[in-house]
Protein backbone atom coordinates (compact mmCIF):
# COMPACT_ATOMS: atom_id res chain seq x y z
CA UNK A 1 0.00 0.00 0.00
CA UNK A 2 1.38 3.46 -0.87
CA UNK A 3 1.77 5.93 1.99
CA UNK A 4 1.91 9.67 2.34
CA UNK A 5 4.91 11.46 3.90
CA UNK A 6 7.58 9.11 2.58
CA UNK A 7 11.11 10.49 2.66
CA UNK A 8 12.65 7.02 2.49
CA UNK A 9 11.99 3.82 0.51
CA UNK A 10 8.83 1.99 1.57
CA UNK A 11 10.94 -1.15 2.01
CA UNK A 12 12.22 0.24 5.32
CA UNK A 13 8.75 0.11 6.85
CA UNK A 14 8.42 -3.44 5.57
CA UNK A 15 11.67 -4.47 7.24
CA UNK A 16 10.47 -2.78 10.45
CA UNK A 17 7.27 -4.86 10.39
CA UNK A 18 9.21 -8.07 9.71
CA UNK A 19 11.91 -7.35 12.31
CA UNK A 20 10.56 -4.92 14.94
CA UNK A 21 12.86 -3.46 17.60
CA UNK A 22 13.42 -5.36 20.82
CA UNK A 23 10.31 -5.34 23.00
CA UNK A 24 8.09 -4.01 20.20
CA UNK A 25 5.05 -5.76 18.70
CA UNK A 26 3.44 -4.89 15.37
CA UNK A 27 -0.27 -4.03 15.68
CA UNK A 28 -2.84 -5.10 13.10
CA UNK A 29 -6.27 -3.79 12.21
CA UNK A 30 -5.47 -0.17 11.32
CA UNK A 31 -5.15 1.43 7.88
CA UNK A 32 -1.63 2.56 8.81
CA UNK A 33 1.51 0.93 10.29
CA UNK A 34 1.28 0.62 14.08
CA UNK A 35 3.12 -1.01 16.95
CA UNK A 36 3.09 -1.42 20.71
CA UNK A 37 6.12 -0.58 22.84
CA UNK A 38 7.05 0.50 26.36
CA UNK A 39 7.34 4.28 26.68
CA UNK A 40 9.26 6.06 29.43
CA UNK A 41 7.09 9.09 30.15
CA UNK A 42 10.19 11.21 30.80
CA UNK A 43 11.68 10.52 27.35
CA UNK A 44 10.87 13.95 25.90
CA UNK A 45 10.43 15.87 29.16
CA UNK A 46 12.49 19.00 29.68
CA UNK A 47 15.57 18.71 31.88
CA UNK A 48 14.01 20.67 34.73
CA UNK A 49 11.06 18.31 35.01
CA UNK A 50 13.30 15.25 34.75
CA UNK A 51 15.52 16.54 37.55
CA UNK A 52 12.56 17.27 39.84
CA UNK A 53 10.97 13.86 39.27
CA UNK A 54 14.25 12.01 39.77
CA UNK A 55 14.84 13.89 43.03
CA UNK A 56 11.60 12.62 44.55
CA UNK A 57 11.90 10.15 47.45
CA UNK A 58 12.37 6.48 46.49
CA UNK A 59 12.45 7.33 42.77
CA UNK A 60 14.51 4.21 42.00
CA UNK A 61 11.77 2.02 43.46
CA UNK A 62 8.72 3.50 41.77
CA UNK A 63 10.26 4.81 38.54
CA UNK A 64 9.25 1.61 36.73
CA UNK A 65 5.66 2.89 36.85
CA UNK A 66 6.72 5.65 34.48
CA UNK A 67 7.16 3.04 31.73
CA UNK A 68 3.79 2.59 30.04
CA UNK A 69 2.91 0.09 27.33
CA UNK A 70 1.75 2.36 24.52
CA UNK A 71 0.10 1.91 21.15
CA UNK A 72 1.83 3.90 18.41
CA UNK A 73 0.77 4.77 14.89
CA UNK A 74 3.84 5.09 12.68
CA UNK A 75 7.25 3.45 12.75
CA UNK A 76 10.66 4.29 14.18
CA UNK A 77 12.35 3.88 10.79
CA UNK A 78 10.44 6.59 8.89
CA UNK A 79 11.00 10.30 9.43
CA UNK A 80 7.26 10.96 9.37
CA UNK A 81 4.15 8.93 10.18
CA UNK A 82 3.19 6.96 7.05
CA UNK A 83 -0.44 8.00 6.49
CA UNK A 84 -2.84 6.44 3.96
CA UNK A 85 -2.65 7.85 0.45
CA UNK A 86 -6.19 6.66 -0.32
CA UNK A 87 -9.26 5.31 1.40
CA UNK A 88 -9.25 6.82 4.91
CA UNK A 89 -10.47 10.29 5.79
CA UNK A 90 -8.62 12.13 8.59
CA UNK A 91 -11.71 11.82 10.79
CA UNK A 92 -11.96 8.07 10.19
CA UNK A 93 -8.26 7.59 10.93
CA UNK A 94 -8.51 9.50 14.21
CA UNK A 95 -11.57 7.46 15.19
CA UNK A 96 -9.85 4.17 14.32
CA UNK A 97 -6.93 5.03 16.60
CA UNK A 98 -9.16 6.29 19.42
CA UNK A 99 -11.43 3.23 19.40
CA UNK A 100 -8.64 0.73 18.70
CA UNK A 101 -5.29 1.35 20.43
CA UNK A 102 -6.95 4.14 22.42
CA UNK A 103 -9.09 1.60 24.27
CA UNK A 104 -6.51 -1.16 24.43
CA UNK A 105 -3.63 0.92 25.82
CA UNK A 106 -3.34 3.62 28.48
CA UNK A 107 -1.74 5.81 25.80
CA UNK A 108 -2.18 5.83 22.03
CA UNK A 109 0.08 8.10 19.98
CA UNK A 110 0.13 9.05 16.31
CA UNK A 111 3.81 9.93 16.15
CA UNK A 112 5.73 12.30 13.90
CA UNK A 113 2.97 14.17 12.10
CA UNK A 114 4.64 16.73 9.81
CA UNK A 115 3.93 20.43 10.25
CA UNK A 116 4.06 22.14 6.86
CA UNK A 117 7.26 20.34 6.00
CA UNK A 118 9.24 21.83 3.09
CA UNK A 119 10.26 18.25 2.27
CA UNK A 120 6.71 17.11 1.48
CA UNK A 121 4.02 17.92 -1.06
CA UNK A 122 1.23 20.37 -0.31
CA UNK A 123 -1.26 17.49 -0.40
CA UNK A 124 0.65 15.49 2.19
CA UNK A 125 1.02 18.52 4.46
CA UNK A 126 -2.69 19.33 4.15
CA UNK A 127 -3.68 15.76 5.01
CA UNK A 128 -1.39 15.71 8.06
CA UNK A 129 -2.88 19.01 9.24
CA UNK A 130 -6.38 17.60 8.80
CA UNK A 131 -5.43 14.50 10.81
CA UNK A 132 -4.12 16.69 13.63
CA UNK A 133 -7.33 18.73 13.65
CA UNK A 134 -9.49 15.60 13.60
CA UNK A 135 -7.51 14.13 16.49
CA UNK A 136 -7.84 17.30 18.54
CA UNK A 137 -11.59 17.34 17.94
CA UNK A 138 -11.78 13.76 19.25
CA UNK A 139 -9.91 14.43 22.49
CA UNK A 140 -6.28 13.88 21.54
CA UNK A 141 -3.61 16.19 22.96
CA UNK A 142 -1.21 17.66 20.38
CA UNK A 143 2.41 17.70 21.56
CA UNK A 144 5.32 19.26 19.67
CA UNK A 145 7.78 16.65 18.41
CA UNK A 146 11.40 16.70 17.37
CA UNK A 147 13.37 18.91 15.01
CA UNK A 148 14.22 17.22 11.70
CA UNK A 149 17.42 18.71 10.28
CA UNK A 150 17.94 19.21 6.55
CA UNK A 151 20.28 21.09 4.25
CA UNK A 152 19.01 22.33 0.87
CA UNK A 153 21.65 21.65 -1.79
CA UNK A 154 21.31 25.17 -3.16
CA UNK A 155 25.05 25.78 -3.43
CA UNK A 156 27.26 25.00 -6.42
CA UNK A 157 30.36 23.98 -4.47
CA UNK A 158 31.48 23.04 -0.99
CA UNK A 159 33.41 26.32 -0.90
CA UNK A 160 30.12 28.18 -1.35
CA UNK A 161 28.53 26.10 1.43
CA UNK A 162 31.42 26.87 3.79
CA UNK A 163 31.25 30.57 2.97
CA UNK A 164 27.77 30.66 4.52
CA UNK A 165 29.12 29.60 7.91
CA UNK A 166 30.64 32.07 10.34
CA UNK A 167 34.41 32.51 10.23
CA UNK A 168 34.87 30.75 13.56
CA UNK A 169 32.73 27.79 12.49
CA UNK A 170 34.59 27.50 9.18
CA UNK A 171 37.89 27.47 11.00
CA UNK A 172 36.69 24.88 13.51
CA UNK A 173 35.26 22.64 10.80
CA UNK A 174 38.40 22.79 8.67
CA UNK A 175 40.47 21.84 11.70
CA UNK A 176 38.27 18.81 12.37
CA UNK A 177 38.36 17.74 8.73
CA UNK A 178 42.16 17.33 8.73
CA UNK A 179 41.60 13.84 10.12
CA UNK A 180 40.19 12.88 6.71
CA UNK A 181 43.76 12.35 5.49
CA UNK A 182 44.07 9.34 7.79
CA UNK A 183 40.88 7.66 6.56
CA UNK A 184 39.82 5.43 3.70
CA UNK A 185 36.23 6.19 2.68
CA UNK A 186 34.12 3.79 0.62
CA UNK A 187 30.58 4.05 -0.72
CA UNK A 188 28.96 0.61 -0.63
CA UNK A 189 25.58 -0.07 -2.21
CA UNK A 190 23.32 -2.22 -0.06
CA UNK A 191 23.11 -5.78 -1.32
CA UNK A 192 25.97 -8.08 -2.26
CA UNK A 193 28.58 -6.20 -0.19
CA UNK A 194 26.80 -7.44 2.96
CA UNK A 195 26.15 -11.03 1.96
CA UNK A 196 28.58 -12.35 4.59
CA UNK A 197 27.46 -12.48 8.21
CA UNK A 198 30.78 -11.01 9.33
CA UNK A 199 30.03 -7.75 7.48
CA UNK A 200 26.62 -7.43 9.14
CA UNK A 201 28.09 -8.33 12.53
CA UNK A 202 30.75 -5.62 12.23
CA UNK A 203 28.19 -2.95 11.35
CA UNK A 204 25.77 -4.05 14.06
CA UNK A 205 28.48 -3.94 16.73
CA UNK A 206 29.12 -0.28 15.91
CA UNK A 207 25.38 0.50 15.91
CA UNK A 208 25.20 -1.06 19.38
CA UNK A 209 28.07 1.16 20.51
CA UNK A 210 26.15 4.27 19.45
CA UNK A 211 22.96 3.00 21.09
CA UNK A 212 24.80 2.32 24.36
CA UNK A 213 26.05 5.91 24.67
CA UNK A 214 22.81 7.59 23.56
CA UNK A 215 20.85 9.58 26.12
CA UNK A 216 17.48 8.35 24.81
CA UNK A 217 16.87 4.61 24.60
CA UNK A 218 13.60 3.94 22.82
CA UNK A 219 13.99 1.63 19.85
CA UNK A 220 16.82 -0.89 19.90
CA UNK A 221 16.92 -2.21 16.35
CA UNK A 222 17.83 -5.86 15.93
CA UNK A 223 20.60 -7.54 14.02
CA UNK A 224 17.94 -9.21 11.84
CA UNK A 225 16.65 -5.78 10.87
CA UNK A 226 20.10 -4.59 9.88
CA UNK A 227 20.80 -7.79 7.97
CA UNK A 228 17.60 -7.20 6.00
CA UNK A 229 18.25 -3.53 5.18
CA UNK A 230 21.95 -3.99 4.42
CA UNK A 231 21.19 -6.87 2.05
CA UNK A 232 18.30 -5.13 0.28
CA UNK A 233 19.81 -4.26 -3.10
CA UNK A 234 16.59 -2.71 -4.40
CA UNK A 235 16.21 -0.02 -1.74
CA UNK A 236 18.77 2.50 -2.96
CA UNK A 237 20.78 2.29 0.23
CA UNK A 238 24.38 3.52 0.39
CA UNK A 239 26.73 2.77 3.27
CA UNK A 240 29.43 5.40 3.70
CA UNK A 241 32.20 3.39 5.34
CA UNK A 242 35.20 4.86 7.19
CA UNK A 243 38.34 2.85 7.89
CA UNK A 244 41.70 3.73 9.39
CA UNK A 245 44.12 4.23 6.50
CA UNK A 246 46.96 2.49 8.33
CA UNK A 247 45.30 -0.46 10.02
CA UNK A 248 42.15 -0.94 7.94
CA UNK A 249 40.07 -0.98 11.13
CA UNK A 250 36.40 -0.07 10.70
CA UNK A 251 35.91 3.23 12.54
CA UNK A 252 32.37 4.00 11.48
CA UNK A 253 29.62 3.82 8.91
CA UNK A 254 26.61 5.86 7.88
CA UNK A 255 23.64 4.28 6.05
CA UNK A 256 21.80 6.69 3.76
CA UNK A 257 19.16 6.38 1.06
CA UNK A 258 18.70 8.24 -2.20
CA UNK A 259 14.95 8.70 -2.50
CA UNK A 260 12.79 11.36 -4.09
CA UNK A 261 15.85 13.30 -5.21
CA UNK A 262 17.18 13.61 -1.65
CA UNK A 263 19.91 11.95 0.41
CA UNK A 264 18.28 10.71 3.62
CA UNK A 265 20.59 9.89 6.52
CA UNK A 266 19.15 6.98 8.53
CA UNK A 267 21.65 5.05 10.67
CA UNK A 268 25.16 5.37 12.01
CA UNK A 269 27.67 3.12 13.72
CA UNK A 270 30.82 4.34 15.45
CA UNK A 271 33.82 2.70 17.10
CA UNK A 272 34.59 4.66 20.25
CA UNK A 273 36.92 6.36 21.08
CA UNK A 274 38.62 6.13 17.68
CA UNK A 275 35.63 7.61 15.84
CA UNK A 276 35.68 10.69 18.07
CA UNK A 277 39.42 11.09 17.64
CA UNK A 278 38.91 10.98 13.87
CA UNK A 279 36.05 13.54 14.07
CA UNK A 280 33.83 11.16 12.11
CA UNK A 281 30.66 13.10 12.93
CA UNK A 282 31.96 16.10 11.00
CA UNK A 283 33.80 14.11 8.35
CA UNK A 284 30.65 12.13 7.54
CA UNK A 285 28.59 15.33 7.41
CA UNK A 286 30.85 16.76 4.73
CA UNK A 287 31.08 13.44 2.88
CA UNK A 288 27.29 13.29 2.69
CA UNK A 289 27.01 16.89 1.48
CA UNK A 290 29.64 16.29 -1.19
CA UNK A 291 27.84 13.16 -2.36
CA UNK A 292 24.47 14.92 -2.54
CA UNK A 293 26.03 17.79 -4.48
CA UNK A 294 27.84 15.48 -6.92
CA UNK A 295 24.65 13.48 -7.56
CA UNK A 296 22.54 16.57 -8.24
CA UNK A 297 20.23 15.92 -5.28
CA UNK A 298 18.00 18.62 -3.82
CA UNK A 299 18.43 18.03 -0.07
CA UNK A 300 20.45 16.26 2.55
CA UNK A 301 18.04 15.11 5.29
CA UNK A 302 20.15 14.78 8.43
CA UNK A 303 17.89 13.26 11.08
CA UNK A 304 16.63 14.20 14.53
CA UNK A 305 19.56 14.17 16.93
CA UNK A 306 22.03 16.92 17.95
CA UNK A 307 20.06 19.92 16.65
CA UNK A 308 22.46 22.49 18.09
CA UNK A 309 25.49 20.91 16.38
CA UNK A 310 23.61 20.64 13.09
CA UNK A 311 22.47 24.24 13.38
CA UNK A 312 26.12 25.28 13.67
CA UNK A 313 26.74 23.38 10.41
CA UNK A 314 24.08 25.33 8.54
CA UNK A 315 21.13 22.96 8.86
CA UNK A 316 17.54 24.12 8.78
CA UNK A 317 14.77 22.47 10.76
CA UNK A 318 11.20 21.37 10.33
CA UNK A 319 9.14 20.17 13.28
CA UNK A 320 6.70 17.38 13.88
CA UNK A 321 3.98 16.87 16.44
CA UNK A 322 2.41 13.87 18.11
CA UNK A 323 -1.31 13.30 18.66
CA UNK A 324 -1.64 11.67 22.09
CA UNK A 325 -4.81 9.97 23.30
CA UNK A 326 -4.96 9.29 27.05
CA UNK A 327 -7.55 6.65 27.90
CA UNK A 328 -8.29 7.88 31.43
CA UNK A 329 -10.25 11.19 31.32
CA UNK A 330 -8.66 12.78 34.41
CA UNK A 331 -5.15 11.97 33.17
CA UNK A 332 -6.17 13.27 29.75
CA UNK A 333 -6.95 16.65 31.30
CA UNK A 334 -3.61 16.65 33.11
CA UNK A 335 -1.81 15.76 29.88
CA UNK A 336 -3.40 18.73 28.15
CA UNK A 337 -2.26 21.03 30.96
CA UNK A 338 1.34 19.84 31.14
CA UNK A 339 2.00 18.98 27.47
CA UNK A 340 4.46 21.86 27.14
CA UNK A 341 6.85 20.23 29.62
CA UNK A 342 7.32 17.37 27.14
CA UNK A 343 8.37 19.51 24.17
CA UNK A 344 12.13 19.73 24.67
CA UNK A 345 12.96 20.40 21.01
CA UNK A 346 10.40 23.21 20.85
CA UNK A 347 12.05 24.76 23.89
CA UNK A 348 15.43 24.43 22.14
CA UNK A 349 13.99 26.14 19.05
CA UNK A 350 12.56 29.00 21.11
CA UNK A 351 15.87 29.48 22.93
CA UNK A 352 17.86 29.30 19.69
CA UNK A 353 15.55 31.83 18.06
CA UNK A 354 15.99 34.21 20.96
CA UNK A 355 19.79 33.91 20.94
Task: Give the location of each predicted region.
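N-acyltransferase acceptor-side catalytic subdomain
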Residues: 1-355
Amino acid sequence: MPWRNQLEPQALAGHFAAHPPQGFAVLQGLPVPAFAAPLDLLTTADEGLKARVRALPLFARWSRWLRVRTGFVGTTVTEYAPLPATGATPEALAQAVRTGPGRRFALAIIKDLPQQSPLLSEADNDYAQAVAQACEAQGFVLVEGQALAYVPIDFSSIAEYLARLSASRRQNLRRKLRSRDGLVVRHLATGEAFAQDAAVDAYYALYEAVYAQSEVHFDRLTRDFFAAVLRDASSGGIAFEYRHAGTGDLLGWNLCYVHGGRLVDKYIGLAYPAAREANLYFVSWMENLEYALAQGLTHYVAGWTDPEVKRSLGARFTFTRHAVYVRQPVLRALARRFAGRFESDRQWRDQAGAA
